[in-house]
C-alpha cells in the first residue's frame, strides 16, 4: 500500500429519524425501520411482536456502520409481495440487493434475493438465499412469497408458467417452489421430489429385474455401468439399455411432478402484502462515531 492511501475507518451511525412501521401482519406483529437516514439509506429493520414482547433485528452487526448505510437497506429494498399467513410461529421476511449494491446489474457478486425465516414466532431467524440471478432491484418486483403452516412458497410471477412448469432446483422460481422447515434448515421440495423419484425408479428396476437395480442411485450413470461389463455390450445394446432406463425415469418423474405446487390459501393473511416506507420521513441529523477513538461528528442531513 502506498503512503498516499488511507484505510477508511469504520464509523457507527446514529440518526434522529423516528421509527416507522414498514409492514404489518396484524395489530401486534409488524416490522419497523429504525435509525435510518432515509428509506433507501441504511437503518435497521426489526420484527416486533408486542403481545409476546419480542423485538428481533433482521440483519447483521455491520448494519449499524456507515459502509452499510452507503449500500442502502436490503429489507426495505424488496419490492415483491409477502403474505405471512401461518399461525404456528412460522414467519418469513424477504430482502433484496439494493441499487447501491447491485447497480446496473453488472455486479460481479450478483443480486441475491433472500429471506429471514423464523419457526419460533420471531425470537430467532435464519437466513436463506433463494435466487442469485436477478439483475436489478426491479427484476424481483414480481416475486411473490407466501408463508403457511407447512412452509414457505415462492414464485417469480414475471415468468410465464405453463402446465409443464416445475421447479428444477431451489433457485428455479419459474413455477411455485416450496421450502419446508426441518431440523433447523429450510429444504426445497425439489430435494424431496428427487429423493422420491430415485426411490421409485429403483423399485421399478428391481421389479423388472434389471441387472444394475441394486447399484442404482442419485450418482448412478448407465454408460459408466455399461463400460464395466464383460463381455462388452454392442453399441446397439448399450443404447437400448440406456433408453429403457430413460423411459422409466421420465415416466416416474411425470407421475411425481404431475400435480405440481400451488400457492396455499392461508386461513389468515397479513394486513400488508408489501413493504411500505414513507419517503417523506428522513433524519435531520446524523451522528458518526469513530470506532478507534470514540470521536463523534454530527452532521445535518442535506438530502
What are these regions (language model features)?
Residues 23-39, 83-103, 141-162, 198, ...:
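Short beta-strand elements that form the blades of beta-propeller/WD-repeat-like
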Residues 33-70:
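N-terminal, post-signal-peptide region of Sec/Tat-exported proteins
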Residues 16-21, 64-83, 132-147:
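Repeated scaffold domains used in trafficking and secretory/extracellular systems
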Residues 96-109, 162-176:
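Short, conserved, GDST-rich strand-edge loop motifs in beta-rich repeat architectures
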Residues 56-62, 125-132:
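Beta-propeller fold detector
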Residues 7-46:
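Beta-strand-rich domains and repeat architectures in extracellular enzymes and scaffolds
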Residues 55-99:
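Blade-loop segments of beta-propeller domains
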Residues 48-50, 115-121, 148, 160-167, ...:
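Conserved Ser/Thr-centered positions that define the repeating blades of beta-propeller domains
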